């Protein structure tokens, strides 16, 4: 039914434990779910072997050594067994409700993107625990993307893990597909972590040279879409038009005022 693909960080220390937990949740979704781990980070091959995921070590990188989004999507296109895809950050725990949401949206539309807020929670002990203890991360924190093959034929060479590429994915889908905010129906648990894997830390990931390059590749601030730009919402298993026009107006004002510092 679904091919999940992700580009993990090295499976070391605390982030390694976080990623093992996320990976286990994906492979637990059943035999109809194919899981692809992309890139040659330390521990990725062993993690894939232990969980039954597939490991694809070859992945193009930026000049600074960061995995590229276009390469990840191309690898998924070449290897995926299912036309329904999910690109997800490697620290996010998923549950069966994601599959339910995908089925319901796919039954009503052939071209779509499903996104939604994740919840910040450490060591979630199941969906209900994540929902009870988690804190919503906001409309701009995008960690999973569910879509049918063919939606992203031309992906720029974004640096994964830097600002702006996730917002562009929403903008691109919005051009000729419906974008569904599934926050009300899907619980996705984002586990807290540091930015030790990025030289310069979180500031570099969001405001550094590769973030600035991502903004350029995206086509500027006007294309930094968030959940406020979704055309539809999924609530109680039913699709509705997104009533959040005032929120979209406020979001455009926020984006216009945003400054991206380059160091």
Annotated model-derived regions:
Residues 1-23:
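N-proximal low-complexity "stem/linker" segments adjacent to membrane-targeting elements
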Residues 77, 93-171:
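Conserved catalytic core of nucleotide-sugar-dependent glycosyltransferases
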Residues 3-8, 159-263:
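C-terminal catalytic/acceptor-binding lobe
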Residues 33-40, 114-116:
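Short, hydrophobic beta-strand segments that form beta-sheet elements in well-ordered domains
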Residues 82-95:
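Short beta-strand-to-loop acidic/aromatic patch adjacent to the donor-nucleotide binding site
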Residues 13-15, 41-47, 122-125:
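Short, charged/polar "capping" segments at the starts of alpha-helices
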Residues 37-85:
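Active-site-proximal specificity loops/subdomain of glycosyltransferases
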Residues 20-33:
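Short, acidic, metal-binding catalytic loop of nucleotide-sugar glycosyltransferases
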